[in-house]
C-alpha cells in the first residue's frame, strides 16, 4: 500500500530489511526480490544480498535509496533527500519537486538508534516533507517493546515534538 502512494516524480524511500513488499511495489523485479537473497547470480546483487540490501534508482518516479545492513541507517539518507526536495522546490523553483516526499521505513527496534533521532530532529526542525513509517510489532529483533521504549509506546513518546503529526 505504501509504495502505491509514492507517486511524486522525485519521491524516495529509505528502506530496511523487511521492506521487500515496498520494493516490489516500486518496481523491483520479482525474480530479483526472491532470487538475490537465495544467492542467485545476476540481478541487482549478483547473489550477495543479505536480506533486501539494495537500491532502486528510477529517473521517472520514486527511488529507493541505497540500503545498508545497519539498524536505523535508513533514516538520515531519507532526511537528506527530504532536505533536497525542499531545496529544489523552494530555492530552485523546480516544479518536479512540488508535492514530493521522502519516506523512512523501519521497524520498532530502529527507533532506538541515533539515525532515527537525528532524522526526526531534522524533519521537525526544518519542517521537511518526510514520513516516518514504523512497523511496530512490539519486538525489535529479539527485544520486547517494553524494554526498548519507555512505556512501550513509541507514538506517545513522540508527543512532545512540534511539527510532527502522529
Residue positions per predicted region:
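Short, proline-centered helix/strand-breaking motifs
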Residues: 129-130
Amino acid at each position: 500500500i505504501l509504495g502505491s502512494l509514492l507517486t511524486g516524480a522525485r519521491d524516495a524511500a529509505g528502506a530496511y530489511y523487511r521492506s521487500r513488499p515496498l520494493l516490489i511495489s516500486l518496481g523491483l523485479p520479482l525474480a530479483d526480490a526472491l532470487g538475490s537473497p537465495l544467492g542467485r547470480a545476476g540481478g541487482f546483487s549478483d547473489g550477495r544480498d543479505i536480506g533486501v540490501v539494495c537500491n532502486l534508482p528510477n529517473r521517472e518516479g520514486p527511488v529507493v535509496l541505497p540500503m545498508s545492513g545497519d539498524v536505523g541507517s535508513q533514516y538520515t539518507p531519507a532526511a537528506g533527500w527530504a532536505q533536497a526536495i525542499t531545496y529544489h522546490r523552494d530555492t530552485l523553483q523546480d516544479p518536479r519537486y512540488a508535492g514530493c516526499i521522502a519516506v523512512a521505513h523501519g521497524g520498532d527496534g530502529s527507533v532506538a538508534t541515533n539515525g532515527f533521532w537525528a532524522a526526526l530532529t531534522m524533519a521537525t526542525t526544518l519542517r521537511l516533507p518526510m514520513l516516518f513509517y514504523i512497523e511496530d510489532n512490539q519486538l525489535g529483533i529479539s527485544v520486547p517493546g517494553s524494554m526498548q521504549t519507555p512505556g512501550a509506546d513509541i507514538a506517545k513518546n513522540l508527543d512532545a515534538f512540534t511539527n510532527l503529526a502522529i
